Amino acid sequence: MAENNPLKIHNLRPAPGAKTAKTRVGRGEASKGKTAGRGTKGTKARYQVPERFEGGQMPLHMRLPKLKGFKNPFKTEFQVVNLDKLAALYPEGGEVTVEGLVAKGAVRKNSLVKVLGQGEISVALQVTVDAVSGSAKEKITAAGGTVTELV
């Protein structure tokens, strides 16, 4: 780049020799002609061997074990909230709904919520969520609360 040209995007050029033209092989008998860099005879001179081919050795995709089982396409995914989290979010007790949990940032919206029984609760909660585990239901009712499942 000349000294009088300022460093701007329209003045940039690649360094000399940085960009070279693609070599066209197999055109005449000069350099890279005739056999075109493939040597003489043999499989690799005649056609391309697949990259996965290992020369007769048992290929990797056949050496590895098959995956067992299957993925259930109808599985229902729940966002989990434990009782200790509910006790922290509602220290005075009250009504617990999915919308309320979303507003408090405990769960994301537009997905199912399940309450699990990890932790203890001492205040009465009126829980209305998509699903509740058995242990959580026992602990909530023992504390004087009620449980309503939406699903």
Swiss-Prot record:
It holds the Pfam family Ribosomal_L27A. One of its GO terms (biological process) is translation. Residues 1-60 are annotated as: Disordered. Keywords: Ribonucleoprotein, Ribosomal protein, RNA-binding, rRNA-binding. Coiled coil: none annotated. The keyword Ribonucleoprotein applies. The keyword Ribosomal protein applies. Gene3D superfamilies: 3.100.10.10. InterPro entries: Ribosomal_uL15, Ribosomal_uL15/eL18, Ribosomal_uL15/eL18_sf, Ribosomal_uL15_bac-type, Ribosomal_uL15_CS. GO terms for cellular component: cytosolic large ribosomal subunit. One of its GO terms (molecular function) is structural constituent of ribosome. SUPFAM superfamilies: Ribosomal proteins L15p and L18e. Part of the 50S ribosomal subunit. Binds to the 23S rRNA. Belongs to the universal ribosomal protein uL15 family. This is Large ribosomal subunit protein uL15. The gene is rplO.
